[in-house]
C-alpha cells in the first residue's frame, strides 16, 4: 500500500493437430510375400500386378517423403479480461526483467565485479517471483487503463476488475484457506480521487462513479510468495491536469535515478522535491504551485510486509535531515505525491484498509467474533493488508464489531484514507526497485510509465 504516512500522522486517530507424426509411420500396405504368391499368374496378370505394385510402391515412397506440416507458432497473448495464468504464457518461468540501471560513480564497479555478479546469480528464485508479480501488474493495469477506467464507471467495478485479473493471472483465486498467501493481491486496490491521496478503496455498497473532471490515483499490489510489487499511476481525462501528472511522474523518476546503495535518504528527498516543485498548474485562470506532500513517504518492502516490517526505512519526498542510507539487497517502493493544496494529508472518510500488526503481542480477546475473525485473518492474509470487501468475499458477515475490537486491542492496524484539503487535486506515481548487488532493477517499469 503504497503510501507510508510520516510518524506523526500515524499517531492520529483512526487479488492437435494430432496424428501427423503417427501417420508417417503406418506400415506399407503391399509386401514381398504378396508378390511371391502372385508369381504364377499370366503375363497379362503379372503386368497388371507389376503395374499395381509399382503404383503402390511409388505411393508408399510419396507417403514416406511427405513430412508432417509444422504447426505455426502463434504468440501467446493475454485474454480480455485477463484470465490466462502467467505461468501458461511463460511456461519456463522466464518472466520479463524490469528496467536495468547500472550503478554510477563510486558504485560503478558493482556492474562488472565478479563477486557481486556471483551474489546476484544466487537470487534466481527471488528475481523470478518478483518478475512474475511485476508482469502480472503490467498486464492487469494495461487492461484497466483500456477497458475499466472510464468516466461513468463505478469504483467498485474498477477495483473488482483489477483484483479479479490479478487473482486469475497468479492462478490463486483466494477462496480456499491460505490460497491468498501463495500469490495474489499484495494489498487492496486504492482508487483515490482528487484531494484524497491514498488508502481509499470502495466498501460494500459504494456507489461512487468516476467523473470526467476527476483525477484518480490507481494503486495496487501483486505478490508471489510474499514478494510484493507496489506500483501506482494517476489518470486524468481533462488535459488541464497534465502538468500535475507530469510533475509527479518526473519526481518519481528523479527518486528512482537518485536511489542506490549507500545513498542517503535526505539526498533523495531533496532531489524529488526540487523536481516536483518546479511545476505549477493553471486552473480556471489561477496558477497553483505543485507541492510535494511532505508527510507521505516511499518505503522499504519486506516479504509479506508492505512497509518493510520493524526495521523498515522511509524514503522522504522533501528535503530533510534523515541521514539513513540505502543498502545492498533492499527492495524499495519509490513513490511521490504532489498536491495543489497544502501538501499535507490527514485521516478522512470511511476506513477500508486494514493489516495485521506484525509480531503483535498475545492479547486476550473476549469477543468470540474477534477471535474467529483474527484466526481467519491469520490463515488468509497473514501480514498482507486486506479490505472489507475481501472479508465479504470470504463469506464473513456482521464482522465490524470484531474488527474494531482487533484494532482497539492493537492486533490489527486500520489505515484510513489520507486526504489534503477539499477542492485540491493530488497525483501519485510509484515503482518498486530492487537494489541488486550489481545493478538496480526497476522491476515494475512498463511502457506506460
Swiss-Prot record:
InterPro entries cross-referenced by the UniProt entry: Creatinase/aminopeptidase-like, Met_Aminopeptidase_Type2, Pept_M24, Pept_M24_MAP, Pept_M24A_MAP2, Pept_M24A_MAP2_BS, WH-like_DNA-bd_sf, WH_DNA-bd_sf
Compartment list: Cytoplasm
Catalytic activity: Release of N-terminal amino acids, preferentially methionine, from peptides and arylamides
Similarity section: Belongs to the peptidase M24A family. Methionine aminopeptidase eukaryotic type 2 subfamily.
Polar residues composition bias: residue spans: 15-28
Region feature Disordered, mapped onto this chain: 1-91
Keywords per UniProt: Aminopeptidase, Cytoplasm, Hydrolase, Metal-binding, Protease
Positions with biased composition (Basic residues): 61-75
BP GO annotations: proteolysis
Positions bound to substrate: 199, 307
Record-listed a divalent metal cation 1 binding positions: 219, 230, 430
SUPFAM superfamilies per UniProt: Creatinase/aminopeptidase, Winged helix' DNA-binding domain
Name of the top EC class for this enzyme: hydrolase
Protein name: Methionine aminopeptidase 2-2
